[in-house]
């Protein structure tokens, strides 16, 4: 693989305060600790300047070791990177937010994050990593959100993170946080792809100067088996997507990423494969025609690969209806 530098041609999106976030980043969900460090090293060499992390992924310490090595070697400077992480659902209590953030900073070897997100609008008992029964889940309420959000605002005041935001928030829940926020959310990271286009959410977010980040932009075919459903549609083999790829002379994955960026959404595909890392980065240079965008618009089927049903076990306060605020 020939390394190439993409820093000067990377697309950026402006945030409400004038700072800019790289339009394409490296997702690290499902990247095991044994391989994530090498993937991050290769990504930085290729010109990636945006990493999307989370405490629950269990690999932040290895990412931190890779970052430290890159800083020492002069591959990249901290101020050239955009690094996001996420607050897990067992640390929503106001007293738990700063310790959780400080643990992430320690693992990543950083003094600050560029962006810190509430990972899910779901609350777990403090001593539980991932719930195995419904009684380990607590209700997500306006009062609980307000306490969490005020602690995140304090983290910004302390300089521990530059921006705060949310993930997996519906339009209704975005309105909820906006109604109580001194510092409004900069980003809402949600599942976004041609089968789940979320146009209403995108329109609302744009109206509030909130940027959407698209996770699972390629359909997340490699997610854990427990998260997969029988006979689910495969984005990467969709005939419309592949027809456009043939016209453009690129891969189906590149069409999906170019589509996301062209809609004004950040996208964070995960890969540990050097060739795919490079292909994904090149997608930022692809421009789809109006006709191609119109064809993709017709593919929306409101299909979630990450349905959230793992929060809805018996005895849980969560249903798919109140999680996504859909009828």
From Swiss-Prot:
Record carries keyword Signal: no
Active site: 57 (proton donor)
Keyword Oxidoreductase assigned: yes
Thermal dependence: Optimum temperature is 60 degrees Celsius for the reduction of methylglyoxal.
Alphabetical list of CDD domains matching this protein: AKR_AKR3G1
GO molecular function: aldo-keto reductase (NADPH) activity; aldose reductase (NADPH) activity; carbonyl reductase (NADPH) activity; NADPH binding
Site (Lowers pKa of active site Tyr): 86
Pfam families xrefs: Aldo_ket_red (PF00248)
Residues noted as binding NADP(+) in the record, renumbered to the chain: 18-27, 216-280
Entry EC no(s): 1.1.1.184
One GO cellular component term: cytosol
Regulation of its function: Curcumin non-competitively inhibits the enzyme with respect to furfural. To a lesser extent, enzyme activity is also inhibited by indomethacin, coumarate, coumarin, and alrestatin.
Sorted UniProt keywords: NADP, Oxidoreductase
Entry's pH dependence statement: Optimum pH is 5 for the reduction of methylglyoxal.
Domain of life according to the entry: Bacteria
Record family assignment: Belongs to the aldo/keto reductase family.
Subunit structure: Monomer.
Function: Aldo/keto reductase with broad substrate spectrum. Catalyzes the NADPH-dependent reduction of aldehyde- and ketone-groups of different classes of carbonyl compounds to the corresponding alcohols. Highest enzymatic efficiency is observed with 4-oxonon-2-enal (4-ONE) and 4-hydroxynon-2-enal (4-HNE), that are lipid peroxidation products, and 9,10-phenanthrenequinone (9,10-PQ), a photoproduct of phenanthrene that is one of the most prevalent polycyclic aromatic hydrocarbons in the environment.
Name of protein: Aldo/keto reductase slr0942
Taxonomic source organism: Synechocystis sp. (strain ATCC 27184 / PCC 6803 / Kazusa)
């Amino acid at each position: 693989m020939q390394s190439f530098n993409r820093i000067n041609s990377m697309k950026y999106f402006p945030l409400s305060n004038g700072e800019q976030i790289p339009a394409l980043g490296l997702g690290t969900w499902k990247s095991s600790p044994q391989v994530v460090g090498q993937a991050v090293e290769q990504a930085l060499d290729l010109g990636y300047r945006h990493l999307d992390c989370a405490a629950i992924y269990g690999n932040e310490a290895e990412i931190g070791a890779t970052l430290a090595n890159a800083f020492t070697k002069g591959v990249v400077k901290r101020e050239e990177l955009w690094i996001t992480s996420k607050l897990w659902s067992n640390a929503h209590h106001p007293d738990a937010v700063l310790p959780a953030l400080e643990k992430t900073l320690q693992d990543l070897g950083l003094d600050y994050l560029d962006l810190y997100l509430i990972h899910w609008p779901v609350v777990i008992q403090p001593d539980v990593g991932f719930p195995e029964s419904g009684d380990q889940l607590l209700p997500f309420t306006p009062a609980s959100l307000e306490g969490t959000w005020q602690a995140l605002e304090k983290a910004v005041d302390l300089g521990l993170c530059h921006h705060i935001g949310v993930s997996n928030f519906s339009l209704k829940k975005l309105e909820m946080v906006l109604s109580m926020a001194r510092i409004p959310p900069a980003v809402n990271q949600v599942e976004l792809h041609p089968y789940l286009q979320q146009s209403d959410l995108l329109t609302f977010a744009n109206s509030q100067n909130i940027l959407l980040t698209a996770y699972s932009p390629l359909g997340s075919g490699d997610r854990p088996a427990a998260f997969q459903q029988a006979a689910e549609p495969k984005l990467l083999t969709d005939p419309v997507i592949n027809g456009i790829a043939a016209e453009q002379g690129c891969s189906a994955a590149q069409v999906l990423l170019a589509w996301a960026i062209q809609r004004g959404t950040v996208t964070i595909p995960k890969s540990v494969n050097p060739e795919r890392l490079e292909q994904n980065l090149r997608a930022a240079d692809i421009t789809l025609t109006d006709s191609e965008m119109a064809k993709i618009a017709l593919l929306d089927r409101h299909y979630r690969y990450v349905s959230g049903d793992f929060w809805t076990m018996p005895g849980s306060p969560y249903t798919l209806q109140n999680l996504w605020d859909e009828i």
